[in-house]
Regions:
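Long, contiguous binding/interaction regions
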Residues: 1-4, 8, 12-44, 49-167
Length: 167
């Protein structure tokens, strides 16, 4: 099963290497990885996607919690969460198809961010399945020159009570 694991760790040299080393040593695969500082500049957040049974994921979380730089570890897929990924696509488009392709991009929730005479670069932020469909659909009307995906990011949802209070 696919899992999104969020790891907060000290923003120090070697911290990411230790996390990656844990996965490598134990033979676990990282499907996607994103790392950035949090609102606290001394703490970074790693969001990674991996696959495994519940017992394997529990073992991964347990081992991650033992690493010296790790502040917290959470399997986001264990609760309600929102997941997003960014994709950038460089498209070569024939002039007679440009309006149709541009229209599809907008209807799908994407944006043309760099138009050119022979194509454009587009972006879409969505979940993995929506991005997969977007890429396949665009490949029908345009030539995909380059596809760049960020990998998944995940955040736990607010509780229902907290959402109602905010409204």
């Amino acid at each position: 099963m696919r899992h999104i694991i969020a790891i907060n760790l000290q923003n120090e040299a070697g911290a990411l290497t230790r996390v990656a080393g844990l996965f490598s040593t134990r033979g676990y695969n990282i499907e996607s990885l994103s790392v950035a500082a949090t609102d606290d500049p001394t703490v970074s957040r790693i969001t990674l996607v991996t696959r495994g049974s519940d017992s394997v994921i529990q073992q991964i979380v347990s081992q991650l919690n033992k690493l010296i730089d790790v502040v917290s570890v959470e399997d986001k897929t264990q609760g309600e969460h929102i997941e997003r990924e960014l994709v950038l696509l460089k498209l070569k488009v024939r002039p007679e198809q440009a309006d149709a392709v541009r229209g599809y991009v907008v209807r799908a929730g994407g944006r043309v961010i760099d138009p050119a005479s022979d194509g454009f670069i587009v972006e879409l932020t969505a979940n993995e399945a929506e991005i997969d469909k977007f890429v396949v659909d665009l490949s029908q009307g345009a030539q995909l020159l380059e596809v760049v995906r960020s990998g998944a990011l995940g955040i736990s949802r607010l509780t229902r009570a907290a959402r109602l209070r905010r409204e």
